[in-house]
Design a protein with these regions (language model features):
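C-terminal helix-coil-helix/basic helical segment that borders enzyme active sites and/or dimer interfaces
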Residues: 2, 7, 240-272, 280-292
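DPxDG-like acidic metal-binding loop motif
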Residues: 110-144
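Glycine-rich beta->alpha junctions and the first turn(s) of the following alpha-helix
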Residues: 155-239
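Glycine-rich flavin
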Residues: 2-119
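Short, charged, amphipathic alpha-helical segments
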Residues: 225-232, 258-266, 295-298
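Generic structural signal for well-ordered, non-transmembrane alpha-helical segments
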Residues: 202, 232-239, 265, 269-276, ...
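Glycine-rich phosphate/cofactor-binding loops in nucleotide/flavin-utilizing enzymes
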Residues: 289-334
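Buried hydrophobic positions in well-ordered alpha/beta secondary-structure cores of metabolic enzymes
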Residues: 55, 107-109, 169, 204, ...
Length: 334
């Protein structure tokens, strides 16, 4: 399945379908609709598609040189305490800067949670100076001797095809993108964070559709009432998240340079809660059959809980509450 996902991603890129509108440019909803569509088909594919399109948006926002035609990108920003990548300028190693004027560097260290690293042609990742300052962003071509993609450690069942493995860099050539802190401080950071909620919503919609189909086929009967109750709960949950995403997209397009952190936290937490409702209600209403006899349903039901763990759960609720306490509850009014 991992090879199939990589092939499908490349097909989307080659067909121009990964050239999504930039977030905050007036078509944010269209961007998120594309993410949701891919998510509804395959969440491992959505994970890689979202990373590729996020990397392109980041490099465009930070004024990076054009990407090679047909290239596929991973966006890797996880910073666990036991995995860090540091850089030194190439001219410190006796080499000149790149001809395109970018700051050429050498990367050393290990990067964790690199989704799609086995198939990506390039990576965009957070890196640090040897003195601990940063983070910076660096873009790196994967096909070079100084890049080693791990084949171990990824034991996931859900999201297995996203293959979020470790990558080890040993004097790998790369170029810095933007100044220190640019990745976290740019307005697009939270635009991208909100977009992940669209992927989750797409996956949840596919599971919900199975419940809808089963309920609609059975018609109105007392025996079907439990499915109808479940479908009502699922309908409310999905509509809640979809409405929040539409509202957030309009706001971001109207305020592209403003802080969208609270909006992003709301849509992510809403999408997570809605997906939890869908997972619970579809299982209770449909029983074991689709989990055991419908390969697409079974994979989606296995993938979605794993992808949702990209949420920070209660920590995000705390951040949202802190923000509301500081700015006020104006958005509660109609």
């Amino acid at each position: 399945h991992a090879h199939e996902v990589a092939r499908k991603l490349q097909a989307l890129i080659d067909a121009g379908l990964a050239k999504l509108p930039a977030p905050g440019g007036g078509q944010t909803l269209e961007r998120w609709q594309a993410l949701a569509r891919v998510g509804s088909q395959d969440l491992s594919l959505a994970k890689l598609f979202e990373g590729h399109t996020d990397a392109l948006a980041i490099m465009r926002e930070l004024g990076a040189p054009p990407m090679p035609p047909g290239s596929s990108w991973g966006m890797w920003a996880a910073e666990p305490p036991d995995a860090k990548v540091v850089f030194q300028p190439m001219n410190d190693a006796g080499e000149s800067n790149a001809a395109d004027g970018a700051h050429s560097v050498l990367l050393d260290g290990r990067k964790a949670w690199c989704s799609g690293a086995k198939s990506a042609s390039h990576g965009l990742l957070t890196v640090w100076r040897s003195d601990g300052s940063g983070p910076f962003l660096a873009r790196v071509a994967m096909a070079q001797p100084g890049v080693q993609v791990s084949t171990e450690g990824w034991l996931a069942i859900g999201m297995a095809a996203s293959a979020s493995v470790d990558v080890v860099f040993s004097s790998a050539k790369a170029q810095l993108v933007g100044p220190a802190g640019a990745y976290l401080n740019r307005p697009g950071f939270w635009h991208g964070g909100a977009g992940i909620a669209a992927c989750w919503l797409g996956g949840a919609q596919t599971l919900a559709d199975a419940l809808y189909q089963a309920t609609a086929r059975a018609g109105s009967s007392e025996k079907n009432m439990l499915r109808q109750i479940a479908l009502g709960k699922v309908d409310m949950a999905l509509r809640h998240t979809a409405a929040l995403l539409r509202e957030a997209a309009v706001w971001i397009d109207a305020h592209p340079a403003a802080d969208a952190s609270l909006l992003a936290l709301r849509v992510r937490l809403s999408a997570e809660a809605s997906a939890d409702v869908v997972l619970a209600e579809t299982g209770r209403a449909l029983g074991a059959a689709p989990f055991c006899k419908d390969a697409g349903f079974a994979r989606m039901a296995c993938d979605l809980p794993v992808y949702l763990r990209q949420s920070h759960a209660e920590r995000d609720f705390a951040s949202l509450g802190e923000g509301v306490a500081a700015t006020g509850p104006q958005s509660w009014a109609l």
